[in-house]
Amino acid sequence: MTSESGSNSKWKDFLLNPKYNIVAVLAFISIFLVIGPILPGVSWFSLGDFSLDMVNFYHTIMIPFVFLLILYASELLGLGMLERKAVNVSTYPILLLTLLGTVFFYPASTQTADYVLQALRDVWMLVLALMFFVYLLMLPFRDRQKFKNIWGAYSLILITTVSAGIAAVMGMIYEYGNLFGYASLPVLNNDVMAWGGLQTFLGNLVTSHSHQMLPAVMGGIVGLAAVSFGYEKLSSVKRNIVNAGLVIAVIGTISMSYLYFISSFGTYVIPAIFTSGTGGMNGLALDDSQTGIIGIGALVTIIGLYYLLSGNRADRLVQISELLTWIATMAVMIGVGYAMEFNETYYGFGSPGVPPNGGPGYQYDMAFTDGHLLFAFFLMPLMAGILLLIMHYIKEFNTERRLITYFIIAGTIIGGFGVLEYVMTLSWVVESIGLALLIIAIIIITYTFVKSATEKDGVKGTQPAN
């Protein structure tokens, strides 16, 4: 009986050990990043939007990544014991459902199983997100001092959780309608018909889902980073600078979410602003201006977070790498993306033809679509989130941490300039080198976590909040 009790205790400690669960998710992500190029239909560099196969591959990595962020945020903020246990014990079920869904995605004979497994995984994730949200709401009442210290970061994490949750529900509604239509839901079906019909509604819905989810996730990462840096230790002036940036990001998240909501569930068409050229083709899409506000808020927070850079070289390099991912993302999205939007009479929104129905440089627009999805919407969020894990959990292994940051800094700079070259020449070679360096960094990070987690002083099971 004692032996059985000891065995159960070991399994309990294993399943509730955040570091072990982080290792599992990182290993899962690393494996799929490595085998991705050989999966059927997965083509990293193909002009235009992601194919269905590429979208499936993208979600295979990014959904576990979002789970990883929930796990980390729950531990970082010291949310309720029940919530943290629920998240930790969900690690392997989420990974297993994702794996099986990916395997069953390819054969036509198993697509129904794929739909069921991925739907189960998505509902599970939504339940975890709701638990996370509820416990976030409780935090100011459970620990008023912590809330006062990090109110700006807390507000951004809370709002981005809501925004990402709405985007997730949009994705689920889209999948249901895409598979079955809405005839079985008369009230919704009547609205869909009034909003322009099934295909119009589905198009608006999937656009809102994809355009809202990643800015919300990146905004959440900024909030988590502020807490991870320990910005509450700053002087009041510098702390207020960080809080100002976080509030700017909150405003951008709310306005972005509102725009995508009314453009999905209604007839509102998101306009462009500051238009010019034939048919008003040149101009900044209003939704892009709002997602840009989130990024601007992130850049403002850097001004204050700079003063928290560590004197330890390895720690400092990790912190600099984190901030660099934000800067690189904004450089691509604003520096390249905005410039193209104000010259759509040439780029043609990625459509061949002449203005206002297309443009001679449409292929370069398609190159940007592919390049920025891979860099700014894929590898940069991955790096930004995973770096926070290193910052929080890995305090030793200075050699490995320095090596990791060298790969990240090089990959981020080369990858960012690679997007620009892709847009200018249609050559994706430089960007591919940058992305390869970032993937190597993730593999080394996974190895370092394995090494750290297996040490005797590794993190034990989930502990009560202080």
Task: Label each residue range with its predicted role.
Residues 2-4, 454-466:
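Short, charged juxtamembrane terminal tails flanking transmembrane helices
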